[in-house]
C-alpha cells in the first residue's frame, strides 16, 4: 500500500483531486481504526494546532461510528458522540481552512 501524505497547511491550495485524495485517506484511516491490527501508511503534516484538530476529528468520527454500531442512531450515547464530533469538525475547519470531507 502506498504511503499517503496529508498536508494540512495547504488549505487554500486544495483542488478537487487533492480533496478527493484527502477524503479517501481519511476513510482508510477510519476503517483501519475500526479493524484491529490494520495499519494505514499515512503521514500528516501541519502545525501542532492543526494536527491536534485533525486527531480530534478522526477520534470523534471513530467514537461516533462505535456508538452508532453499538447503540443505534436514536440513542443518547450516539447523539452525545455526534455533538462532540461536530465540535471537533468545526475546530478542524477553523484551524486548517479545509472542509471536513464526511460532514453530514
Residue ranges and their predicted role:
Residues 1-6, 68-71, 78, 91:
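Terminal amphipathic/targeting segments at protein termini used for secretion
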Residues 3, 8-16:
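Proteolytic processing junctions in secreted/extracellular precursors
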Residues 17-27:
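Cleaved targeting-peptide boundary
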Residues 26-35:
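Long, non-catalytic architectural segments outside compact domain cores
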Residues 34, 38-57:
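Short, charge/polar-rich alpha-helical segments
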Residues 40-42, 67-79, 98-100:
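Charged, low-complexity interaction regions
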Residues 53, 57-61, 67, 74, ...:
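Amphipathic coiled-coil alpha-helices
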Residues 64-68, 84-103:
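Amphipathic alpha-helical coiled-coil segments
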